[in-house]
């Protein structure tokens, strides 16, 4: 890939305030990342769209709004552009329409603030639509985020040859943490309460609530239709595309949302994975490859006591060794965590 000509980002933080699913660090995660993008990676403020569910947010992170923002990024990208999506919020696993789709027999999804789910098949479709020479990096700090780009090649994950020895480590020092997980049954129950219809198929409720703005991959959950391969997915081999996923955990694991105990205003809530990425970037101001960044973040989480959360990397072989966000040269970080 040639050096990026334009850098465009969509940052999404969902705290689900005043609900039983409330998290605390997700908005902080993406605001810190926005500062990093500008100070270190050459992004311009006007090319970064931030969607949060804060009370004063001008654009809420609904499924439709997230989809539109990502769709604009992909549609307007030119060869050499660098696209970035950072999501911090809840994730879920959906029973697969195709039971042998992959090992966990479920599809990964993120949970926007209105529960209009966006699935791994949706992200695959976005990557397939990329123009040649455009990179699309995703950081998903959510539960079950491993494999969030469907069929992306695993570089660091459950079956990776990259092993970090799990030596004895202290448990998480700040015990006030919560998994970024909403179980599928809870998602279905919530959507059922909103739609008012009786159905065990999630697609029925999503269609009733969101119509054509729902995920196309969930419309035919009752009578599943295999996704077509006749579209833009034929432009390049699946293992040669420019989708890059840095996930907060494996597909069968949870990611942690940390809320420092007490009323210490100097310690903000954060997502464990987002914080580990930001700490690694702050401590190593030189160029880091995608592989190096994930390995260092995985090691840091282990040192912090997160022995059951393993960040993963999914991308082509070439992109595994490519610089994170195609950084060139050494740039000092001006922002703080």
What is each model feature region?
Residues 18, 40-44, 73-77, 113, ...:
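Generic recognition of well-structured, leucine-rich alpha-helical segments
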Residues 61-88, 92-157, 165-185, 189, ...:
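Caspase-like (clan CD) cysteine peptidase catalytic core
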Residues 1-105, 121, 234, 241-243, ...:
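Boundary/activation segment at the start of structured domains
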Residues 9, 188-266, 280-337:
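Caspase-like cysteine protease fold
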Residues 16, 27-28, 107-157, 209, ...:
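Catalytic cores of nucleophile-dependent amide-cleaving enzymes
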Residues 44, 49, 59, 157, ...:
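Intrinsically disordered, low-complexity segments that are common in secreted/host-exposed effector
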């Amino acid at each position: 890939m040639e050096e990026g000509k334009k850098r465009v980002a969509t940052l999404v933080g969902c705290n689900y305030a005043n609900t039983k699913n409330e998290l605390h660090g997700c908005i902080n995660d993406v605001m810190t990342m926005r500062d990093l993008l500008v100070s270190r990676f050459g992004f311009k403020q006007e090319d970064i769209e931030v969607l949060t569910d804060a009370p004063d947010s001008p654009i809420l992170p609904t499924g439709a709004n997230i989809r539109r923002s990502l769709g604009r990024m992909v549609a307007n990208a030119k060869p050499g552009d660098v696209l970035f999506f950072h999501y911090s919020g809840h994730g879920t696993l959906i029973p697969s329409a195709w039971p042998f789709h992959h090992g966990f027999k479920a599809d990964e999804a993120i949970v926007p603030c209105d529960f209009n789910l966006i699935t791994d098949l949706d992200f695959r479709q976005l990557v397939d639509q990329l123009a040649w020479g455009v990179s699309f990096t995703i950081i998903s700090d959510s539960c079950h985020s491993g494999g969030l780009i469907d069929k992306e090649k695993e570089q660091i994950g459950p079956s990776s040859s990259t092993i970090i020895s799990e030596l004895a480590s202290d448990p998480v020092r700040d015990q006030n943490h919560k998994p970024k997980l909403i179980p599928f049954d809870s998602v279905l129950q919530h959507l059922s309460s909103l739609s008012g219809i009786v159905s065990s198929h999630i697609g029925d409720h999503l269609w009733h609530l969101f119509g054509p703005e729902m995920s196309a991959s969930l419309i035919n959950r009752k009578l599943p239709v295999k996704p077509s391969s006749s579209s833009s997915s034929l432009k390049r081999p699946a293992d040669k595309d420019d989708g890059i996923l840095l996930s907060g955990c494996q597909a069968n694991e949870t990611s942690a949302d940390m809320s420092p105990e007490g009323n210490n205003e100097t310690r903000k809530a954060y997502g464990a994975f987002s914080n580990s990425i930001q700490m690694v970037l702050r401590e190593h101001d030189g160029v880091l490859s995608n592989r190096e960044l994930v390995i260092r973040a995985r090691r840091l989480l282990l040192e912090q006591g997160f022995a059951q959360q393993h960040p993963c990397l999914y991308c082509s072989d070439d992109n595994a060794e490519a610089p994170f966000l195609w950084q060139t040269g050494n740039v000092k970080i001006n922002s703080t965590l």
